[in-house]
């Protein structure tokens, strides 16, 4: 059974529906490739998939150890190749993990390894550079 239904809307745009939940998103070609840039581009969604997979997979494993990662945040930068063929050359992820209390070094190392081995990370082509920076911060009382 299909997971996603995609309609081509014309003018380099698509409408995408997640069939299980009914959630809907649109895509648009980027401005540097004839689009308007008014929605995520397909390559933006690849970069987004890596970031969301990293934090979701880390949170699954953190939860097993009683560690809450709510309040953590990522900034994702997608860098396109300057030479043909057009492709994503690099995805930079700046991840701030906020938790209280901070986990011990062994737990941090185990969780950080997940950033490089989540399902999306290991599914992407090896020529696509994945630059992941992780910083740990103690969560404030409002977040923890």
Where are these regions (language model features)?
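Extended beta-strand/beta-hairpin segments
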Residues: 1-48, 59-144
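Alpha-helical metal-binding/catalytic segments enriched in His/Glu/Asp
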Residues: 53-54
């Amino acid at each position: 059974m299909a997971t996603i239904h995609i309609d081509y809307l014309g003018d380099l745009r698509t409408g995408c529906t997640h069939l299980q939940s009914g959630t809907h998103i649109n895509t648009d070609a980027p401005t540097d490739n004839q689009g308007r840039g008014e929605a995520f581009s397909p390559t933006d969604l690849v970069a987004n998939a890596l970031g969301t997979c990293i934090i979701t997979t880390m949170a699954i494993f953190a939860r097993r150890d009683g560690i809450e990662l709510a309040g953590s945040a990522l900034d994702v930068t997608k860098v396109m190749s300057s030479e043909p063929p057009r492709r994503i050359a690099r995805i930079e992820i700046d991840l701030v993990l906020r938790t209280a209390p901070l986990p011990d070094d062994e737990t941090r190392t185990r969780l950080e390894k997940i950033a490089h081995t989540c399902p999306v990370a290991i599914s992407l082509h090896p020529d696509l550079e994945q630059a992941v920076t992780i910083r740990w911060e103690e969560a404030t009382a409002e977040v923890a």
